[in-house]
Amino acid sequence: MDIISAMQKRKSTRAYLAKEVSRRDIEEILSCAVLAPSAINLQPWEFIVTYGDEKERLVRRLLKARLERQVKCGPGTDNPLPERISLRAKEAMAIMEPHISAPGQTFNQFIEEGSCSFYGAPVAIIVVIDKLFPAIRYLDVGLAVSYLLLAAHAKGLATCPIGLIAAYNDDISQMLNISEEKEILLGISLGYADENSPANAFRTRRADLKEIITWYE
């Protein structure tokens, strides 16, 4: 699969088959992720991979923490978003909600519970960075995550980046023995997509180029 095709076809997946992902495939995907560029080759990213019983223990811990703290999904900004930006989120919710709604479960509940369970994926990857790095180095980590997502897609695997779990930094760090010097940036679900699930039967729209590009000639 060429890189353009992978970029065009990949999407976030929120329902997975109960099919094991081999360690070899995980290692191959991560070996592609670390090829991403970084400032003066700092390579500030680290990946913690959980699967099997350890992944299930992590999920139970996160779901328990969610019930105790009720962390809500959202953009995480201190000030209201500009309308043109907030409309994108509202449009995405309108597209997604009919596919994921269930009796007694709201959109937010689906996202919050799904985030804490990695949407049932067999593999959960935790992405961390050393706290000594300035925030600008998050961009380097983002590049590595993009490489990871595309490499997974090229191998026939599905993913979903999950930012909400960063709110449970203490729980995850304690369970996985992550140093206090490390910061959890996000999680990534990894597995084989359940193509028959309504949760995967949609694609969100991207802004038109004229909305995001300024040309100077």
What are these regions (language model features)?
Residues 6-13, 83-90, 185-217:
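C-terminal helix-cap and adjacent tail motif
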Residues 28-34, 123-175:
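Small-aliphatic-rich amphipathic alpha-helix that forms the alpha element of a beta-alpha
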Residues 49-134:
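Glycine/small-residue-rich phosphate/adenosyl-binding loop
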Residues 173-180, 200-202:
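Short proline/glycine-enriched turn/loop segments at secondary-structure junctions
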